[in-house]
């Protein structure tokens, strides 16, 4: 059974924990409480299997605290990560600049493929959720961008997250198959 490690990173108060709980069908948190360090959620998704074999997959979703005081822990969090989801609050202009640092640190410096990274513009309840005017600078503008609004259209982000998980698992499966072929030949 394949096991994938996915990091949820991004600025403070961007909605990482709320989104992580929703996507893993964990408990709801009603009041804001900053994540201290990391919170690991383990889950399986029946819609995601390894290739056509129907083999199940396990996931670890690492909900990482957004405070820079945890920066010394980041190398340990990044170890053996298969994917990174950068969550930001689209209604806070400074977050657009901050996600460049998150991308550089968690994707570029780890030599993670861009296809293993997804941006989530999280719109908090009552924010209106304007999806049109996000000016992302290169190389962020090449990444998969998903808007999440759990109040108005919760299933959109769930569907996109499942597609993302499938792409991670397919990549892991192909890599494992290549390694097995090298052993055989």
From Swiss-Prot:
Positions of modified residues (Phosphoserine): 137
Keyword Nucleotide-binding applies: yes
First-listed, main subcellular location of the protein, grouped into a coarse class: other
Keyword annotations from UniProtKB, A to Z: Cell projection, Cilium, GTP-binding, Nucleotide-binding, Phosphoprotein
Compartments reported by the entry: Cell projection, Cilium
InterPro entries documented for this protein: P-loop_NTPase
GO cellular component: a single term: cilium
Residues holding GTP: 10-17, 63-67, 123-126
Alphabetized Pfam families for the sequence: Roc
Presence of keyword Transmembrane: no
Molecular functions (GO terms): GTP binding; GTPase activity
Task of the protein: Small GTPase-like component of the intraflagellar transport (IFT) complex B.
Subunit structure of this chain's protein: Component of the IFT complex B, at least composed of IFT20, IFT22, IFT25, IFT27, IFT46, IFT52, TRAF3IP1/IFT54, IFT57, IFT74, IFT80, IFT81, and IFT88. Interacts with IFT88. Interacts with CFAP61.
Family listed: Belongs to the small GTPase superfamily. Rab family.
Protein name: Intraflagellar transport protein 22 homolog
Organism in which the protein naturally occurs: Rattus norvegicus
Primary gene name: Ift22
